[in-house]
Amino acid sequence: MIFPNINPVIFSIGPFAISWYSLSYVIGILLGWFYANKIIEKFKPQITKKNLEDFITYAVIGIIVGGRLGFVLLYNPSRYFSNPIDILKTYQGGMSFHGGALGVIIAAYLFCRKYKVNFLSLTDIIATVVPIGLFLGRIANFINGELYGRITNSSFGIIFPNSDLSPRHPSQLYEAFFEGLVLFCILAYATFKHKTLEKRALNLGLFLTFYALFRITIEIFREPDMQIGFILDSLTMGQILSIPMLILGSSLICQSTLK
């Protein structure tokens, strides 16, 4: 199957350009904010709409700074250390989910400390809405023809323009489906059916656990990062970074359900 060659740039006016990738971040944050407000209205956790509104700026900074530094330090440090100015060129791509997640957690901690908000209540809300952004981000990765999968002979293999001429797994779409849509449904079902927000850290634990399981599995189909390759002969960086998430998530689930 030939890649549906979609221009990564939606439109441009002079040097100013709007890309699908940047738009996915904007829409993801707005939809996440809207969904989080609906959750707060229904369940009235120890988070108010005003708290959420005040946190948006912290969240955006955490996502961008954490995501970018995570990519720079974990995936291609030699390039950026030799050309530090490139670190600021986020429009060229290069964001790490694990770095962004850590950035948001740090931002949430600083916010909660300043405004005297319960940290676990806030991170439970964040975890519940994050799959929206994950779904949109992976779709944008697919449009950009980046982060594609390994070579496959299956009928749904796609020839990406930025790779060789071999058909490859559309691993971005696998991630969009499982880390985005399926994970969103799991957390929505847990939240609305089983009222998991009543148990602090349970939604956070569910998110970390299922995201890690999905990511570790889908990495089997995803081409390892060229500048890193395999680690310990068979593991990818994404799998290694997801293992601590799996351990922490499982621990939070056990701790919150046994109380």
UniProtKB/Swiss-Prot annotation:
Enzyme class: transferase
Keyword Cell membrane: yes
Transmembrane parts of this sequence: 16-36, 55-75, 92-112, 117-137, 172-192, 201-221, 228-248
Entries under InterPro entries matching the protein: Lgt
UniProt binding sites for a 1,2-diacyl-sn-glycero-3-phospho-(1'-sn-glycerol): 138
Pathway: Protein modification; lipoprotein biosynthesis (diacylglyceryl transfer)
Topology of this chain in the membrane: Multi-pass membrane protein
GO annotation terms (biological process): lipoprotein biosynthetic process
Keywords noted in UniProt: Cell inner membrane, Cell membrane, Membrane, Transferase, Transmembrane, Transmembrane helix
GO molecular function per UniProt: phosphatidylglycerol-prolipoprotein diacylglyceryl transferase activity
GO cellular component: plasma membrane
NADP found in the keyword field: no
One Pfam family recorded for the sequence: LGT
UniProt-listed Enzyme Commission number(s): 2.5.1.145
Compartments in which it is found: Cell inner membrane
PANTHER family documented for this protein: PHOSPHATIDYLGLYCEROL--PROLIPOPROTEIN DIACYLGLYCERYL TRANSFERASE, PROLIPOPROTEIN DIACYLGLYCERYL TRANSFERASE
Entry similarity comment: Belongs to the Lgt family.
Its biological purpose: Catalyzes the transfer of the diacylglyceryl group from phosphatidylglycerol to the sulfhydryl group of the N-terminal cysteine of a prolipoprotein, the first step in the formation of mature lipoproteins.
Protein name in UniProt: Phosphatidylglycerol--prolipoprotein diacylglyceryl transferase
Organism ancestry: Bacteria, Pseudomonadati, Pseudomonadota, Alphaproteobacteria, Rickettsiales
